Amino acid sequence: MEYIIKSILEDIINNVIMSSKIIGVHINREKTLKKTIEKLYKYGGNALQIFTSNPSNCSPANLDKYIKEYESIKDLQCNFVIHASYTINIGSLDPKQMKLNMNTITTDLIIANKYKAIGVILHVGKYVKNKPEDCIKQMKVFMLEIIEFIKDNNLNTKIILETGAGQGTEMIVDIDDFNNFTKDFDKKYFGVCFDSCHVWSAGFDIIEAYNKLKQNIIVIHFNGSKTPKGSLKDRHEQLFCDTNTIPIDKLTTFAKNLKNVMIILETPNEDEYAKEIDYLRCV
């Protein structure tokens, strides 16, 4: 029985590896990263998005732990991307907070380099109670410092900025503003993460917005949206359910346009991952 299960798992893994599409999920971590990757294989995925530390605070990851754990997974076929903590605000004007943010993100970049990950994803900054123009300037300075860190340390990974939903005081939510903010960054060290839920919630057509940004897009967060277009809410939804407000035919057309990018599902129900990954492979 154990041999049969092992054989089935090996067949799944081989089929996933042979696929030319890089598709995966952000799933809750198992006890070990190796077990998490094995779970990913069962869903039919070959890409994994992870947090390296608690996403609800800005504390840097345990670098030594991740360097050691790499030895247990280095022979497995898996494409990684790291998502930085949700609480990091790269538009903050607080020097102490910015220093902590820098430490946390540079640690993630070192881990990303070790794991041969495509990069580290950041959310756009928030101005909170400050002047938006001051915070946008600071956000630009921060991004350039991160790019300089990657360059100076010869890291083979990128810093990736994710499109915003417009929730709260998020900045550069408008697609043209986002494009203008990012267009001059060195593409050797920088890329864009396009989130279909965020863009829809921000009030934009996902296909039109994608076409404006596609030259810099290296990761897609392929999500449905629980809230209507233009709601300015970050509420992800499964792809195939009545409460997804993005029409499935639009998502299908969008998926057909995606070439040479990593696609990550952040939909809320793990029971649907196998079905959703299969859908993305077949379109």
Report residues per predicted region.
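C-terminal helical cap(s) of enzyme catalytic domains, especially alpha/beta-barrels
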Residues: 273-283
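Active-site beta-loop-alpha junctions enriched in small/polar residues
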Residues: 26-30, 53-55, 85-87, 125-127, ...
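N-terminal pre-domain/capping segments
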Residues: 12-84, 92-107
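Aromatic/hydrophobic pocket-lining residues that form the small-molecule binding cavity
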Residues: 33, 66, 70, 101, ...
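Acidic (Asp/Glu)-rich catalytic clusters
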Residues: 39-44, 64-81, 108-114, 148-154, ...
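Hydrophobic faces of well-ordered beta-strands that scaffold small-molecule active sites
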Residues: 23-27, 48-50, 80-84, 120-122, ...
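Gly/Pro-rich active-site loop or hairpin
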Residues: 92-95, 171-179, 198-262
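Active-site acidic/histidine proton-transfer and metal-coordination neighborhood
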Residues: 75-76, 90-191, 201
